[in-house]
């Protein structure tokens, strides 16, 4: 058997040399390259893998040839030796021809197979190539390339096809086509379905959030509802605070989110969680519409949920419910009695008057919304609160929005995962299952999630762990990247990338007239690609609630003649919210227009880096005055700007010419060291002068 190189053997089989090399390495054969020659025993071993039929025939043929050789040797003596010498190359040639014949036979076998039938329907993903389409249709790719050519498209086998071209080609073959939807299992949002069309869906309790101005009676109203409707099962025990609770009214359950008002409401919405079905806007009848009332209205409008107005404190002598209704009409909340669609309920949270009417209106509104969920599915929902308990470890208060949650379920919560060890309801009772719209507290997760994070239950614990770990890693990577919050500095870049359609703006000013004038001016800005959208205006300092709303809406805050309070400044830094403070309306307009056009100039501030005292001066011809100096603070650097200060008055401001330490040039000289300094275009240096070095640093906005 003649020796062959690896690539020749692979070529005969019409396969890649890498496959042959891989098989040889499995046989513990050291392979250097595809040019390496194969030994006879190696070829035999490979034949058994790639050509088992040929290997058997080769063995039989070899045995037969051996017998013939022995017989010829006995019969013909010396002549046979001569004959064998003559026949030997012929045998090799014949063997080679036989091998080629067998290879040719093997090569022809696929052609002899019956052609596969063309499917009646195929599916595809974005970016499908000509070759992949040919494989799906069971046709030769050259036919598809020809059809594309007739359509005026020059393509090769690796050319990607768009949807329109794909439909034309497939329609020509008479085959139906359907696009595959690639599902990212790590995206928890895909597990949240609309249950209104599900045949197994049943009615679920409404989830209600109470908002309003401080001291208008939100907490009192919650307490009044709770004490009126919570069953005696709570008596004698301590209520478990899990951020929400359920009551029952005429056989209908209602879930109330017991959260700190606007902040939690918008924080959840900022993370994509649509938890609330109905908002209750509490307005004091003796106080009317206040700044936080307007904020609450804007929050509810942004969340696109129905609002019921609870006019509280009607038992006070100074109460005036009609005035409240009149004021709220200015914000689009028009009472039903006045031809609008907003429900107004007069009540007294302190005495309990009107509580029954409010609950009845909540039930009525929820019936109109047709809130449904399927309890047969795996549970999905949202985190209301979360904390790290020293004795129990990480715990989370969850609101089940669909399906049924069970003790022992494996789940992914935000960017963590776990298995439910224990579950407690709002009455502090241990339970094993929780249906839709039920608030519970669980333990058993690996880390503390954030309020507003979603949770999803998986049947397979390994799947939950895999998805949880992947989300955690992705979150770590995201935190390392720069904040994606919109600011005037990155506005143009986001516009170019198509990420920005509306620029959401919150305006706070010193007087109402200024706020209205600024809002009107901003609305007139017309730059192609993005619209200015005013989502909230108010008079007064910028507070933490403004920052929370800006973060939830991916907007910016403009302060006109006002400053942010301490909490707002800290929150803006933490959340990456852009705040712009101005005193001239024209400057606001110009800045936003420039940002939209990508021409916003960077802002710099001066940063003093060091000071040196002149101890002695030397005048040198062709050089000027050299100041023998001692660095008394910070450092002096070669590229810094400098100013000469004499008796507290700036004499000159310019740049360093040279900075030397002894006779050598220095990049910088630190505090406590002497140096020689010359200043460009300035020689009037005197002993006792202070040379101050400074740098201009770009302000991060």
From Swiss-Prot:
GTP binds at residues 212-219, 258-262, 312-315. Residues 212-219 are annotated as: G1. Residues 48-62, 110-119 have a biased composition (Basic and acidic residues). Its main location: cytoplasm. Residues 312-315 are annotated as: G4. One of its GO terms (cellular component) is cytosol. Residues 237-241 are annotated as: G2. PANTHER family: TR-TYPE G DOMAIN-CONTAINING PROTEIN, TRANSLATION INITIATION FACTOR IF-2-RELATED. It is found in: Cytoplasm. Residues 203-372 form the tr-type G domain. InterPro entries: EF-G-like_DII, IF2_II, IF2_N, P-loop_NTPase, Small_GTP-bd, T_Tr_GTP-bd_dom, TF_IF2_bacterial-like, TIF_IF2. HAMAP family: IF_2_B (MF_00100_B). Disulfide bonds: none annotated. Belongs to the TRAFAC class translation factor GTPase superfamily. Classic translation factor GTPase family. IF-2 subfamily. Keywords: Cytoplasm, GTP-binding, Initiation factor, Nucleotide-binding, Protein biosynthesis. This is Translation initiation factor IF-2. It holds the Pfam family IF2_N. Residues 348-350 are annotated as: G5. Residues 258-261 are annotated as: G3. It comes from the Bacteria. Residues 48-123 are annotated as: Disordered. The lineage of its organism: Bacteria, Bacillati, Bacillota, Bacilli, Bacillales. GO terms for molecular function: GTP binding; GTPase activity; translation initiation factor activity. One of the essential components for the initiation of protein synthesis. Protects formylmethionyl-tRNA from spontaneous hydrolysis and promotes its binding to the 30S ribosomal subunits. Also involved in the hydrolysis of GTP during the formation of the 70S ribosomal complex. Residues 63-89, 97-109 have a biased composition (Low complexity).
